[in-house]
């Protein structure tokens, strides 16, 4: 496939939008002289740029675009906007609010609540730092109102960004049709494009009533953001990062919180050091971690929910217990892909047993011209991953960068636990499995951050560096402690670039910080 010519903008810079227009036969405007350009700018400033208008399609007509994106979440929006920048006529189909899980019921409102919880923790330390009368009364409704206002503002920003990029927003639910060429139908109207991206994300899983009687009395992480008051008594079910984060937030803000897990540790897919330390920190912070436990039944009573559970510690007889007066039972047991309502079978688009759309390394499905990115694919369920994959795809499709694809190796991730976790690369066990135990060297440390030098409340900071072969290439970094969420990004760049232990040793550390402990590890 031939690359588009590097057409120049009026300022002499390469413009892929101009190149794309030229390749489609659109005339390119000639560069204006500087004086004329300034005059035009002044004139344009006095009026709003008109939006492109066209005759409305008839009811039976099929509307065509260069790029159709199903899903207005982070990945879909990023891909659509990048495609538009490259000259494509794009449209986004969204049945709910723009921004997807991340903006509406995920990363963004979660981080606001985590920040709130951190304030609560620091309040307890103010006396140790010499401040008196530091006991503050928390009002859940105040932060909920401010949080929701912030989210609404982001929804508007996304809407404005699409409008400025001349990307059409199609409101409604998309389903594929049986037409000869890939086509979707939204609210009775059909749309088609040579390139269609599925970026519909995922949704929280919850058990069926047939599995756990009364399960529907609980909520999911989506429902967490609808709570009007801080629950007095909370039970969180799950051992993944969502369960850990919500349990930590509720506990820090004053809710009596139990975290029910099937095994003896949380975050079992993380490095063993992180899994062990995070479990301990939860317990130290006052979260009741119910290990080897599962919910058996949920009942509604006059004083709240009654949660019956069974605890089956290996080597012991199972024990049945009940937690009464529960205000909030929250299921955080995983996420399912939003793929069932798309009629994928009409085109024969393949999915796995859970409904995740199967794609190759270039985000292609098994059907030509149909692609998928983000949580609906079930791989690395992180907002920045969906954004990066969506943009890479746009460059491949509309800039003819045939090798443009996301490298899924060494993706950094953070858990907003208390204290936060940062991790990138292979765990110790993964490295041993990949390189052999004799070829793996581990460096680790554990210490109390300087912040806690004068506080009664203590949290640890633990760090681990995983290195491979004689050159000791750093293939993994894992840490939990104050500030680890912010310090990870720089270390992730080093890991991505292939840094060695010697590179870290040769770097002068910043003192006094927690991050300096990772540089000269022994």
From Swiss-Prot:
It is an enzyme of class 1 (oxidoreductase). It catalyses: 2 glutathione + NADP(+) = glutathione disulfide + NADPH + H(+). The modification N6-acetyllysine is found at residue 97. Its EC number is 1.8.1.7. InterPro entries: FAD/NAD-bd_sf, FAD/NAD-binding_dom, FAD/NAD-linked_Rdtase_dimer_sf, Glutathione_Rdtase_euk/bac, GSHR/TRXR-like, Pyr_nuc-diS_OxRdtase, Pyr_nucl-diS_OxRdtase_dimer, Pyr_OxRdtase_I_AS. Glutathione binds at residues 74, 81, 158, 391. Binds 1 FAD per subunit. GO terms for biological process: cell redox homeostasis; cellular response to oxidative stress; glutathione metabolic process. GO terms for molecular function: flavin adenine dinucleotide binding; glutathione-disulfide reductase (NADPH) activity; NADP binding. NADP(+) binds at residues 239, 242, 245, 262, 268, 334, 381, 414. It comes from the Eukaryota. Keywords: Acetylation, Cytoplasm, Disulfide bond, FAD, Flavoprotein, Mitochondrion, NADP, Oxidoreductase, Redox-active center, Transit peptide. FAD binds at residues 74-75, 94, 101-102, 110, 174, 375, 383, 511. One of its GO terms (cellular component) is cytosol. Residues 1-43 form a transit peptide. Disulfide bonds join 102-107. The active site is a redox-active disulfide bond. Belongs to the class-I pyridine nucleotide-disulfide oxidoreductase family. PANTHER family: GLUTATHIONE REDUCTASE (PTHR42737), GLUTATHIONE REDUCTASE, MITOCHONDRIAL (PTHR42737:SF5). This is Glutathione reductase, mitochondrial. It comes from Callithrix jacchus (White-tufted-ear marmoset).
């Amino acid at each position: 496939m031939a690359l588009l010519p590097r057409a120049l903008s009026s300022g002499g810079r390469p413009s892929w939008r101009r190149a794309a227009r030229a390749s489609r036969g659109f005339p390119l405007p000639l560069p204006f002289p500087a004086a004329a350009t300034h005059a035009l700018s002044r004139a344009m400033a006095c009026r709003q740029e008109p939006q492109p208008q066209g005759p409305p399609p008839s009811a039976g007509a099929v509307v065509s675009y260069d790029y159709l994106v199903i899903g207005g979440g982070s990945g879909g929006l990023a891909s659509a906007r990048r495609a538009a920048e490259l000259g494509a006529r794009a449209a986004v189909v969204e049945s709910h609010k723009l921004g997807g899980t991340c903006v509406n019921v995920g990363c963004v409102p979660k981080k606001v609540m985590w920040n709130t919880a951190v304030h609560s923790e620091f309040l307890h330390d103010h006396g140790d730092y010499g401040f008196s009368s530091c006991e503050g009364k928390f009002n859940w409704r105040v932060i909920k109102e401010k949080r929701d206002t912030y989210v609404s503002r982001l929804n508007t920003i996304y809407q404005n960004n699409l409008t400025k990029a001349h990307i059409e927003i199609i409101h409604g639910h998309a389903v594929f049709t049986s037409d000869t060429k890939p086509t979707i139908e939204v609210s009775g109207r059909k749309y088609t494009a040579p390139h269609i991206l599925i970026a519909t994300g995922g949704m929280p899983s919850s058990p069926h009533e047939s599995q756990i009687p009364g399960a529907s009395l609980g909520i999911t992480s989506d429902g967490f953001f609808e709570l009007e008051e801080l629950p007095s008594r909370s039970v969180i079910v799950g051992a993944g990062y969502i369960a850990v984060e919500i349990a930590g937030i509720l506990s820090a803000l004053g809710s009596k919180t139990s975290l029910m897990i099937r095994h003896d540790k949380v975050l079992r897919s993380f490095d063993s050091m992180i899994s062990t330390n995070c479990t301990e920190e939860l317990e130290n912070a006052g979260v009741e971690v119910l290990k080897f436990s599962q919910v058996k039944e949920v009942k509604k009573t006059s004083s709240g929910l009654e949660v019956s559970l069974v605890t089956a510690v290996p080597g012991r007889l199972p024990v049945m217990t009940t937690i009464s007066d529960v205000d909030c039972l929250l299921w955080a047991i995983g996420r399912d892909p939003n793929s069932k309502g798309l009629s994928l079978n009409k085109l024969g688009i393949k999915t796995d047993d859970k409904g995740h759309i199967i794609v190759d390394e270039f985000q292609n499905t098994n059907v030509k011209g149909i692609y998928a990115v983000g949580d609906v694919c079930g791989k690395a369920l992180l907002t920045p991953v969906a954004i990066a994959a969506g943009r890479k795809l746009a460059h491949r499709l509309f800039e003819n960068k045939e090798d443009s694809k996301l490298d899924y190796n060494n993706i950094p991730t953070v858990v907003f636990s208390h204290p936060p976790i940062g991790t990138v690369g292979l765990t110790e066990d993964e490295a041993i499995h990949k390189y052999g135990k004799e070829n793996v060297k581990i460096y680790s440390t554990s210490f109390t951050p300087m912040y806690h030098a004068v506080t009664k409340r203590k949290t640890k900071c633990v760090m681990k560096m995983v290195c491979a072969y004689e050159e000791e290439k750093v293939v993994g970094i894992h840490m939990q402690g104050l500030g680890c969420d912010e310090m990870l990004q720089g270390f992730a760049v080093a890991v991505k670039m292939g840094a060695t232990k010697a590179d870290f040793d040769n770097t002068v550390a910043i003192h006094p910080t927690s991050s300096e402990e990772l540089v000269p590890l022994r």
